[in-house]
């Protein structure tokens, strides 16, 4: 596994950079000395990001485009290489979602979620891979979701797109073994970004992320760590994230029982909202920058949730051990 502890001078394309994880990751990479090419549909937002990068002493090229349009993707990569002479890192961060029960979601919403979250990653990867192979090195860093290894009500299309993207990334990693090209993934928990202020909803009420919610900088710092030490999968909310993954593997029925009963309630408010399209097909003006209207969950609440998960996981593991011992005694 190649390491790049000093990122100064590397060139990165960051997609979905007009808000949220893409925006904050771009800033953190710029602080580490990475030269940026930022892209999204909203050029005015990208220009604001560029100003912040320049104020921090970084370099930033703005190249607006839509990840669902192959010509835009190819142009962004072409402009980046023409400007900097190469590209070393691709951060796939563009994402959308749509809230509603599966049979309520318009079919075009489902296909659009896949076109952005899944095929958008594919398009950019195919556009940069020839450059990576010619250079003999490169790094594909994909912003994934904890839902890539799980599920949630009201987010069936989003969760399915993330499952597909993680499977693709893991397969691509095997194909690229020994080429000098690395593949990394960040399994993102709920973070306070404008995504939840942009997303369409079929519910007639304002949606919110599944708690607990973390600050977006948690993910951006994980992106920088992976840029330095590529070829891994990072779970930024380490203890709680790992516990959730372990619990889902050890006793999936527990998570299923909780989410089927409370999952939809945890993601909705009593605030009426008529937003059937959101930013799926057309960019919206509001929600520029890294953070959204839903604040991060206070640390003490996250700690309490982690303790609860730890106790639940411990109980499941303990029950499994006792059950195994009983079975062994029975067959002796």
Label each residue range with its predicted role.
Residues 178-270:
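SDR active-site lid
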Residues 11, 18-19:
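Conserved glycine-rich cofactor-binding loop
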Residues 34-49:
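Conserved glycine-rich Rossmann-like NAD(P)H-binding loop of the short-chain dehydrogenase/reductase
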């Amino acid at each position: 596994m190649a390491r790049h502890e000093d990122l100064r001078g590397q060139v990165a394309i960051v997609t979905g950079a007009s808000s949220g994880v893409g925006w904050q990751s771009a800033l953190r990479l710029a602080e580490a000395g990475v030269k940026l090419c930022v892209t999204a549909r909203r050029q005015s937002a990208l220009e604001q990001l560029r100003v912040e990068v320049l104020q921090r002493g970084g370099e930033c090229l703005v190249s607006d485009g839509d990840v669902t349009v192959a010509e835009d993707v190819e142009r962004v990569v072409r402009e980046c290489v023409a400007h900097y002479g190469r590209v070393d890192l691709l951060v796939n961060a563009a994402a959308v979602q749509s809230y509603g029960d599966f049979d309520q979601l318009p079919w075009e919403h489902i296909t659009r979620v896949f076109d952005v979250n899944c095929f958008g990653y594919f398009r950019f990867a195919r556009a940069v891979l020839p450059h990576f192979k010619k250079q003999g090195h490169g790094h594909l860093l994909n912003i994934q979701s904890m839902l890539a290894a799980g599920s949630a009500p009201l987010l069936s299309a989003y969760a399915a797109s993330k499952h597909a993207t993680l499977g693709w990334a893991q397969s691509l990693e095997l194909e690229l073994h020994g080429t000098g090209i690395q593949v990394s993934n960040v399994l993102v928990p709920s973070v306070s970004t404008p995504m939840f202020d942009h997303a369409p909803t079929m519910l007639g009420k304002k949606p919110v992320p599944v708690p607990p919610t973390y600050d977006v900088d948690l993910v951006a710092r994980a992106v920088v760590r992976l840029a330095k030490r590529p070829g891994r999968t990072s779970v930024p909310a380490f203890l709680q994230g790992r516990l959730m993954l372990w619990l889902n593997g050890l006793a999936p029925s527990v998570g299923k029982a909780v989410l089927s009963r409370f999952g939809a309630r945890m993601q909705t408010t009593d605030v009426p909202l008529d937003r059937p399209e959101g930013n799926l097909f057309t960019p919206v003006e509001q929600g520029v920058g890294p953070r959204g209207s839903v604040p991060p969950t206070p640390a003490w609440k996250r700690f309490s949730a982690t303790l609860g998960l730890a106790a639940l996981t411990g109980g499941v593991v303990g029950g499994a051990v006792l059950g195994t011992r009983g079975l062994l005694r029975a067959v002796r």
